[in-house]
Swiss-Prot record:
SUPFAM superfamilies associated with the record: Actin-like ATPase domain, Heat shock protein 70kD (HSP70), C-terminal subdomain, Heat shock protein 70kD (HSP70), peptide-binding domain
Function statement: Acts as a chaperone.
UniProt induction comment: By stress conditions e.g. heat shock.
Protein's name in the database: Chaperone protein DnaK
Disulfide-linked positions: none
Keyword terms of this UniProt record: ATP-binding, Chaperone, Nucleotide-binding, Phosphoprotein, Stress response
Residues with the Phosphothreonine modification: T173
Originating gene: dnaK
Family label: Belongs to the heat shock protein 70 family.
Organism: Bacillus licheniformis (strain ATCC 14580 / DSM 13 / JCM 2505 / CCUG 7422 / NBRC 12200 / NCIMB 9375 / NCTC 10341 / NRRL NRS-1264 / Gibson 46)
């Protein structure tokens, strides 16, 4: 079975890993980094992904960042006259990860396990699966990020029973999960979180502080200047990282803007204490889900054996301090918070291929599922934190006499009223025989698969008529749309490969021009003038083709020049070989002429005694 890669598709950074020799390994990207920024840019019709896209985001308005925040919504971003859905943008990132995983493994990769925040709802999970499909990946399993982290942490610790709290503060999402490990079983007891809280928000409080300080000093609002704002974002992210290791950092942004008197510079010292003051409300916000998860699992903080930190933002000292205070436990730091989720996904990939034995993953549904019933009430069929896969049925009836159809309004959430929860979908069961209200028996069944994706059916028990729906969010893509996007993604991959081929051809041509010039210099006075002239002409023709950027001509002229240079080199070697032979023959003749010469006697001196 071909390898199943593990992908942590993050808001800020993404990471890909694979199981090799029973051990999960992170696959470095072409730049040698172990994580890749989740950034996509479009420039002159060319797509850029990762570090290269992030670097030029200041000057390129066609740069998309943190697209994960919009998964499962009907948000679109327009670039160069074309609208892109979050699924398509995520697919471009996944395609990039897939391509360098293939280069590393030396084989085609078509299967993946992709992680999502534990608190992702059905629409967000479905969108992630669609993104994988568009990228040409068969998504074998969608697993929750904290669960993946626990897998990576606990694979070699499954003999002892442990209760683990995973605190996952990513770039744009926050999750807490409580898991029980024992006998190779990873059971999620509870999960809670906030899909609109992450490292980006910590950056934002620094940006707001810089904007307000600069406005106080210079009377100019930098938040209105797009270019300045991007520089502030980069500086804020760097300052946040610096303050994890030092108690104060200098933020210096020369020529940030211009006033009436000329250019203005931003110079400011940010202390860790000030940063903690600015972000204290965010740290406190993360404690709510921690308490919620403990309550749902029916545990007290003292019953937690280990705390694992996931996500780069957990390096913030105030965050670590808050967790320690809440749980009374020092967080375990034996795993890299940026890589642990991808490593866990790779282990789950190994479970699927059968390379990892005796590991069972029991995940849970993060939110309750149910339908709207009379009076706009939300009636739950599956409670949150139910182990998946699972199915549940309940019998309902009609609300009015002679009602021949019922609307099934499927919802996900925790609020008592239907209107306050997230609509997953609607469908209708028709042709119910007319009868007094309360008489027809309509069985509604919910089924959640191992990826957390929901199927709902309604059946009239009297007639046996059934209607079902696989939940697709309002942003859910139809099969035709996915098919079209897959085609586009493949075409783009071909275009990218063609571009790479073109660059390589130009590089080879440049290299050949350089080596030809060097060879001709070495051949001065040693080669036939006509041959040298021919080589020079071919070299100039290739240079002209490079200037014109005509690829077919470059290829033809390159092949021509290569043949001439090879011929010249061969002649040079032949000439050198002839000369060497002539010298050898000359040396042998000299030896014959000297046959009558008598060798001189010699005396060898020895320290002990003279010998003659």
């Amino acid at each position: 079975m071909s390898k199943v890669i593990g992908i942590d598709l993050g808001t800020t950074n993404s990471c890909v890993a694979v199981l090799e020799g029973g051990e999960p390994k992170v696959i470095p990207n072409p730049e040698g980094a172990r994580t890749t920024p989740s950034v996509v840019a479009f420039k002159n019709g060319e797509r850029q992904v990762g570090e290269v896209a992030k670097r030029q985001s200041i000057t390129n308005p066609n740069t998309i960042m943190s697209i994960k925040r919009h998964m499962g919504t009907d948000y679109t971003v327009e670039i160069e006259g074309k609208k892109y859905t979050p699924q398509e943008v995520s697919a471009i990132i996944l395609q990039h990860l897939k391509s360098y995983a293939e280069s590393y493994l030396g084989e085609t990769v078509s299967k993946a396990v992709i992680t999502v925040p534990a608190y992702f709802n059905d629409a967000e999970r479905q969108a992630t699966k669609d993104a994988g499909k568009i990228a040409g990946l068969e998504v074998e399993r969608i697993i929750n990020e904290p669960t993946a982290a626990a897998l990576a942490y606990g694979l070699d610790k499954t003999e002892e029973d442990q209760t683990i709290l995973v605190y996952d503060l990513g770039g744009g999402t926050f999750d807490v999960s409580i898991l029980e490990l024992g006998d190779g079983v990873f059971e999620v007891r509870s999960t809670a979180g906030d899909n609109r809280l992450g490292g980006d928000d910590f950056d934002q409080v620094i940006i707001d502080h810089l904007v307000s300080e600069f406005k106080k000093e210079n009377g100019i609002d930098l938040s209105k200047d797009k270019m300045a704002l991007q520089r502030l974002k980069d500086a804020a992210e760097k300052a946040k990282k610096d303050l994890s290791g030092v108690s104060s950092t200098q933020i210096s942004l020369p020529f940030i803007t211009a006033g009436e008197a000329g250019p203005l510079h931003l110079e400011l010292t940010l202390t860790r204490a000030k940063f903690e003051e600015l972000s204290s409300h965010l740290v406190e916000r993360t404690m709510g889900p921690v308490r919620q998860a403990l309550q749902d699992a029916g545990l007290s903080a003292s019953e937690i054996d280990k705390v694992i930190l996931v996500g780069g933002s957990t390096r913030i000292p105030a965050v670590q301090e808050a967790i320690k205070k809440e749980t009374g436990k020092e967080a375990h730091k034996g795993v890299n918070p940026d890589e642990v989720v991808a490593l866990g996904a790779a282990i789950q990939g190994g479970v699927i291929t059968g390379d990892v034995k005796d590991v069972v993953l029991l995940d849970v549904t993060p939110l309750s599922l149910g339908i709207e019933t009379m009076g706009g009430v939300f009636t739950k069929l599956i409670e949150r934190n139910t182990t998946i896969p699972t199915s549940k049925s309940q019998v309902f009836s009609t609300a009015a006499d002679n009602q021949t159809a019922v609307d099934i309004h499927v919802l996900q959430g925790e609020r008592p009223m239907a209107a306050d929860n997230k609509t997953l979908g609607r469908f209708q069961l028709t042709d119910i025989p007319p009868a007094p209200r309360g008489v027809p028996q309509i069985e509604v069944s919910f089924d959640i698969d191992k990826n957390g994706i929901v199927n709902v059916s309604a059946k009239d028990l009297g007639t046996g008529k059934e209607q079902n729906i696989t939940i697709k969010s309002s942003s859910g893509l139809s099969d035709d749309e996915i098919e079209r996007m897959v085609k586009e993604a493949e075409e783009n991959a071909e275009a990218d490969a063609k571009k790479k081929e073109e660059i390589e051809l130009r590089n080879e041509a440049d290299q050949l021009v350089f080596t030809t010039e060097k060879t001709l210099k070495d051949l001065e006075g040693k080669a036939d003038e006509a041959q040298v002239k021919k080589a020079n002409e071919a070299k100039d023709a290739l240079k002209a083709a490079i200037e014109k950027n005509d690829l077919d001509e470059i290829k033809a002229k390159k092949d021509e020049l290569q043949a001439i240079v090879q011929e010249l080199s061969m002649k040079l070697y032949e000439e050198a070989a002839k000369q060497a032979q002539a010298q050898q023959d000359g040396g042998a003749g000299a030896k014959k002429a000297d046959d009558n010469v008598v060798d001189a006697e010699y005396e060898e001196v020895n320290d002990d005694k003279d010998q003659k």
